[in-house]
């Protein structure tokens, strides 16, 4: 049996994970995701500091370009939209899997033309020396595992992490939330780690009949502050509670688990 916390690189209070989650049909959760896609894309773009407004995102997703905005900001929004559509197609078709292939496939859409390289782990492409870090404001910087040719350590950590989740975590919500934070902490890619890992989180949730989670734009600062503490302390308890609070059924979840 693989030690869960050791394999993932962080811990959390498992007693605080909700045991009862509102469940729906696959058709229902994918319809909800489709209906809310513009909001999800805008929320995710705001977390990245993208200046596009909600009406501008809506216009762009309708196929109309928005004047006065940087090409890079526009492409980031469009990448988020394409990633959302691909995730939806995978879940609806029963083809979503919690594996490296799906993870890198989604990253190839999320970070296209934005990350140094996209669609594979750090070290699996031509860049084998640069190791990115995560800015933590006044707390300094968080540096993940170094980039090595062929990504042997990142692949080992990823494989062990998935094995630990498979052996120790039955709850779809817990597995989904933990994978998001696992991807954010280990930084398997040069950029777009949190975005891609949240897509994986929502793929796990929707495949289990649970509505997807979006971090509201209004909670961007709160999200960033809590993520800094997560990187510093390697304790995900606070972030788990935050993700529950961001779930569309948050009130019902709280009522059912008290």
Feature map (PLM): residue ranges:
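FIC/Doc superfamily catalytic core
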Residues: 1-258
